[in-house]
Structure formats: structure tokens, C-alpha cells
From Swiss-Prot:
Disruption phenotype: Mutant is extremely defective in intracellular growth.
Biased composition (Gly residues): 391-422
The entry's keywords: Secreted
InterPro entries according to UniProt: EspB_PE, EspB_PPE, PPE_sf
Domain notes: The C-terminus is necessary for the co-dependent secretion, for maintaining the EsxA (ESAT-6) cellular levels, and for interacting with EsxA.
Protein name: ESX-1 secretion-associated protein EspB
Bilayer-crossing regions: none
Further comment: Secretion of EspB, EsxA and EsxB is mutually dependent.
UniProt modification remark: Cleaved at close to the C-terminus during secretion.
Cellular component GO terms, alphabetical: extracellular region
Cellular compartments annotated: Secreted
Amino acid sequence: MSQPQTVTVDQQEILNRADEVEAPMATPPTDVPQAPSGLTAANNAAEQLAVSADNVRLYLQAGERERQRLATSLRNAAAAYGEVEDESATALDNDGNGEVDAQSAGGAGAGQTESLEETPKVAAAGESDFTDLKTAATKLESGDQGTSMVNFADGWNNFNLSLQRDIKRFRIFENWEGDAATACEASMDQQKEWILHMAKLSASLAKQANFMAQLQLWARRGHPTLADIVELERLAKDPDYQEQAIKLYAEYQETSEKVLSEYNTKADLEPVNPPKPPAAIKIDPPPPAQPQGLIPGFLMPPGDGSTGLASGMTPPMIPPTGGAGGTPDVNTAELTSAGREAASNLSKGLGVKPMSLGGGGGGLGGMPMGDAALAGGESVRPAAAGDIAGAGQGGGAAGRGMAGGGMGMPMGGAGQGQGGAKSKGAQQDEEALYTEDREWTEAVIGNRRRQDNK
């Protein structure tokens, strides 16, 4: 059998940490890189960088949703340890009927990352095996020559540093220990590792962009310039330099093909594929607390003047005070009815009042009976089967009732020869001589519906 676990909890620390975890992180760059030149390979590289950046931003949004779920779980964990102090005060100010709202900012648990896909690969394509020297130089010298690539790289490098500064929110708790704290810290650690990985991928995007800018610079330095080619074409028209110009043009063409071939190969960038964010730990909100007033409801009388007792419930019975110890446990209804029957068999001169025999208790006093009781009208009811348990038992019960009531009348043996031969069916046909219907006997016979006075 597992032993109870002692935990340390600082609820406010958990709530503050939830706010930290949910706080927005740095915004990733949104600029789209431009091709550094007019070469096909350069355009493909720029498109690949844009596609990779779009997918990284999409994954970062999914990670933000997981952090929100993690924050929700932290708030639910804090709520499970009890209400916040000021919210509890609000509940008391509302006469005990205030409620502490459970945090529920969306479903916590498994993240909805099914729609995330790998970054597609842009079709690798470059210049044809043979490209006219002048055309190649014209394309190579067009474009911004890598300026937007450098800006793109700077943006993602800065974002990388920002992400690394944001992981402080995933530190361990100082004043929360226990299994729940360990599980939440493990989930936060997963989020931290994922953020660090996304920071590395951000640096990878920046590295690819910087590489393209450097590749463009290298190609410009190694490829014959458009101005040199134009000058060579002019010299080729001069008979004195024609042969030398044709030979130099062939060398330029060979150099151009080598530069373009290497450019096409190196500009074939790999897509940046981020991993899916880890699913945040799922902690369901605690069940809503039942509103409880400062005074228990069963002690508060309803406003309509009724007794406030639920259907089927009876008030607590007052225990008998005059019965002798060791008296058999006789049903109260049987005891009371038997006493009434015994009273009916007594002579008028004895002065015994039915009230003194009610339930074997220590007598309820000589309160005057109401008109309805004396008239024997609606207050008289047919006797139940359990009300008349036989003359012998009735006599004995009545004797105990009067003895308990202080009457002291000897009733022993009254059951012999006094109605003991009556059949059970005949007893059931009889009617009770008297049924008490006053507030003074409620504690003995229970609450009954008040009858209209006639």
C-alpha cells in the first residue's frame, strides 16, 4: 500500500509561471528573401528559403498553442490545491455562495499537430549545360547581389538569440514539489529543448541565406564580367586582335561553365524541417466545488414558512424520558395505539388522559384537547394493522406507558381475559379512539399536514 506523499506547494508561483509560459515569445521574421541574381539556381534557392521559413513559422505557431495548453494545465494544477486567497474572500463576501472559476483556456493535452508537414523540396534546376557567355554574365550581374539574403540572415540570427533568451520561463519550480510538479517540469523541459532546436533551425536559415550571398559574391569574382565580354567582342572585330580575342573568348566560356556548374550545385539548398512541438502535459480542471453557504442549508428555514424537510424525511424523534431501563424495543406506533386502547377500557372516574399514555414517554402534560379531537370528526382515522397488537400486548404496553408517565396504575395481568379472544380481523375493523393533531406531540408522532379549521 502506497504511503501518503508530502508535497510542497506555492500556488501563486504556479500561477505566475503559467503566465510566463503563455507569454508571447519573439516574433519570427516575415521578410521574403530575393534571389541574388537572375540565375535559375539563385531563384530556386530564394524560393527554398522562403518555403522553409514559412514552415518554421507554422511550427512555431503550433508550439505557441502547446505552451498555452501547458499554461492551462499549470493553472488547473494550481486550482486543484485550492482557491486563490482573494477569490476565496470573494466567495465569502457573497454569503458563501461565490464560486472560484476553473481555468479552461482550451483543451489541454495532445496537441493538434496532425496538419504539420515536412518542408517541401523545391525542384533543383540550374542553367543548361551550355549557356551563352554574355547571357550568363547578364543574369549573374542582375538582382540585388545578395543584399536581401544578408538582411534575411540577420533577421533569423536575431530571432535565434531571442529564442535562447526566452527559455528562462521553463526553469524548475522553487516551491513546488511532488509528482505533479515533476511531471510539469518534465513537460516544460521538453518545450525548452524544442525551443532550443527551433533556435538552431533559425540559425540554419540564416546560415543558408548568408551562404547564398557569399556564393553570389564568389560567382561574380570568378565569372567574366559583362564589360569584359563586351570589350572582347569589340576586339574580335579588329583584324589585329581577332585571333587573340577568339582564343580569349573560349577561355571565358570555359570559366563561365565551371562557375555556373558549381553555382548550380551549391545553390541547391536543403529544406529546413522542424520537428513537431511536444504535446504539453494534460491536467484536467478540478471538478467545480458545490456552493456552500455560511449556514448549512438544513438549518435554514425556507422562506415560504414550510418545515423545509425533504420529501420522505422525518424530524429526529425525541427519545423517551420516563421509560424504565430494559424496556423491550417496541415500535412507537404500536406502543402508542396500545396505550390508547387501554385508556378506552378504563373507567371514566380514573381521570386518565390519553395524553399521558402517548408513546410511553414521561407524559406530555394536561393540555386541553382541541374541538376536532373531541368531536371525533376528521381527526379520527382507521387503525392500522400495527396499531392493535392484541389485548394482552396492548394492556402490557399501556401499563408501561402509564408507569413511565408517573401514573403508577397497576396494569399487570390486564391482558388476561380482557379482549384477548378478539380475532385479528375484528381488531383491524376497529377505529382509533383518538388521534392527536396538535403541535405539542409533533416530537412524538412526527409532522403531519395541518388540517383546515372547520
